[in-house]
């Protein structure tokens, strides 16, 4: 396979001269760092190569070093951009402040203006549509529960079989297959949720996009608008998007004929149809709209479910109490959206896992669109990228023995009137920023919660699970991301007991 280093640019002398000009600009006109200390900025590291490498392999240690200074804000060079890291105490003040832009902070990092990585609406619509579409989906979750449960059952039976013998399975592959099938059912209906070609695209798009972004970001920013045309990961991503179009557009045409028909018929919710009607004739790319939503939805939910399953492998003492809760709650009330809300121990295990092992160690990214003076006098210069330190999740006053995993932690907190408001999994707080906070909080967290609980219900009632002997599933940290090892395995077998059938 072609490597990035093997690509030769024409006129290397021109490139070299351009780099010298940039170096001169840096030396003559250094960036305004304000009065904030920098944790990993080094003299003569003009292109921040050393700083970025340090962050890539020691991000958590660098973040902790900044917190140990006792300052409420400090600068940290990451492998993406330099962030002003703020302690979580500022999250409540900033969460809805329009002087800080969320999309303005994320879009340049994700290179959304490059073909294959782009947004899908002209003008400002491209950032308005995904949250609107997901919020519309949230209203349908109560009706979708039995359908999502059916897809979870189908996927698990296909991948894990009904074998009563212990056999090893991949945790990441299982979870990704489940999320792909269930989320496609939620977004696009029954037409595509078992389509192998579409599911392959849905499962791999997020990873392929991340690889393409990393490939482009390895080049200087002034070359990125051109170099992406020649990079193999970008070309492969554009081919995959075209394959997705070939699958989605015929489905969209059928949706259009249905909702434009003079015959009023009751139709299932379709994200394709919702976005098409929301556009009201505006030019947009229906395929990129769906892929953008999928890229976010899959990452959040897959990361959560993988880590919860890994925790259960490490804490098998939780499996039977969780199973008994499912039997008690779902056996009495049936498998409905409202009964999922009553699985408080399961929700506690999920939230405790997310508290200790969020997908990213910093969060709630914003860009200061103007100079901002906070209430305590802290001045944030215009153009500053900010992120929050996620430090309150280790506050011992809020979470006794915060470094220790306690699956019952949030269930016990429900008994404390002063802390009960912190317990719902989908509730955002400055002490728990895994889903963000404020008006830009992740709108897909409700779907993620329901999908995670449904998956766990099916696993707990139908299978025995355990860690592979001598090889417990472990996490792998890289930069700001903390993910389950892609090679993580577990052992499973079909249970003999069958308390009741999971159905709506």
Swiss-Prot record:
Domain of life: Eukaryota
Pathway: Mycotoxin biosynthesis
Major subcellular location class: membrane
Known cofactor(s): heme
Keywords: Alkaloid metabolism, Heme, Iron, Membrane, Metal-binding, Monooxygenase, Oxidoreductase, Transmembrane, Transmembrane helix, Virulence
Catalytic activity field: fumitremorgin C + 2 reduced [NADPH--hemoprotein reductase] + 2 O2 = 12alpha,13alpha-dihydroxyfumitremorgin C + 2 oxidized [NADPH--hemoprotein reductase] + 2 H2O + 2 H(+)
UniProt record, GO biological process: alkaloid metabolic process; biosynthetic process; secondary metabolic process
Task of the protein: Cytochrome P450 monooxygenase; part of the gene cluster that mediates the biosynthesis of fumitremorgins, indole alkaloids that carry not only intriguing chemical structures, but also interesting biological and pharmacological activities. The biosynthesis of fumitremorgin-type alkaloids begins by condensation of the two amino acids L-tryptophan and L-proline to brevianamide F, catalyzed by the non-ribosomal peptide synthetase ftmPS/ftmA.
Protein name: Fumitremorgin C monooxygenase
């Amino acid at each position: 396979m072609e490597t990035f280093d093997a690509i030769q640019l024409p006129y290397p002398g021109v490139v070299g001269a351009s780099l010298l000009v940039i170096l001169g600009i840096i030396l003559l006109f250094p960036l305004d760092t304000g009065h904030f200390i920098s944790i990993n900025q080094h003299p003569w590291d003009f292109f921040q190569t050393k700083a970025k490498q340090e962050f890539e392999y020691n991000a958590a240690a660098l973040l902790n070093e900044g917190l140990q200074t006792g300052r409420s804000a400090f600068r940290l060079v990451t492998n993406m951009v330099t962030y002003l890291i703020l302690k979580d105490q500022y999250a409540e003040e900033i969460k809805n402040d329009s002087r800080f832009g969320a999309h303005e902070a994320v879009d340049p990092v994700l290179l959304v203006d490059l073909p294959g990585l782009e947004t899908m609406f002209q003008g400002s619509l491209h950032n308005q549509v995904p949250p609107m579409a997901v919020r519309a989906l949230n209203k349908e979750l109560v009706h979708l529960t039995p359908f999502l449960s059916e897809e979870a059952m189908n996927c698990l039976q296909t991948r894990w079989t009904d074998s009563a013998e212990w056999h090893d399975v991949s945790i990441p592959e299982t979870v990704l297959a489940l999320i792909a099938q269930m989320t496609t059912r939620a977004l696009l209906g029954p037409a595509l949720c078992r389509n192998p070609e579409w599911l392959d695209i849905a499962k791999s798009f997020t990873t392929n996009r991340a690889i393409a972004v990393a490939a482009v970001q390895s080049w200087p920013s002034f070359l990125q608008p051109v170099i992406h045309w020649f990079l193999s990961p970008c070309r492969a991503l554009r081919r995959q998007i075209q394959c997705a179009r070939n699958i989605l557009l015929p489905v969209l045409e059928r949706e259009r004929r249905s909702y434009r028909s003079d015959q009023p018929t009751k139709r299932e919710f379709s994200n394709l149809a919702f976005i098409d009607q929301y556009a009201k004739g505006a030019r947009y790319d229906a395929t990129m709209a769906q892929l953008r939503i999928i890229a976010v939805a899959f990452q959040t939910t897959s990361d959560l479910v993988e880590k919860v399953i890994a925790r259960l492998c490490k804490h098998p003492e939780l499996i039977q109490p969780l199973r008994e809760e499912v039997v008690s709650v779902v056996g009495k009330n049936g498998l409905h959206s409202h009964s999922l809300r009553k699985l408080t121990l399961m929700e506690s295990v999920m939230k405790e896992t997310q508290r200790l092992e969020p997908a990213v160690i910093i969060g709630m990214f914003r860009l200061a669109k103007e100079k901002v003076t906070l209430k305590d006098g802290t001045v944030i210069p215009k153009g500053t990228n900010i992120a929050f330190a996620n430090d309150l999740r280790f506050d011992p006053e809020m979470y006794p023995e915060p470094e220790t995993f306690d699956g019952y932690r949030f269930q016990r907190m429900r008994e404390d009137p002063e802390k009960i408001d912190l317990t719902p999994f989908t509730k955002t707080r400055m002490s728990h920023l895994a889903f963000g906070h404020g008006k830009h909080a992740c709108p897909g967290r409700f779907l993620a919660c329901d999908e995670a609980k449904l998956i766990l219900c099916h696993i707990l009632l139908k299978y025995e699970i355990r860690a592979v002997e001598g090889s417990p599933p472990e996490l792998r940290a890289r930069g700001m991301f903390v993910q389950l090892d892609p090679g993580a395995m577990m052992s499973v077998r079909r249970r003999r007991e069958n308390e009741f059938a999971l159905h709506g």
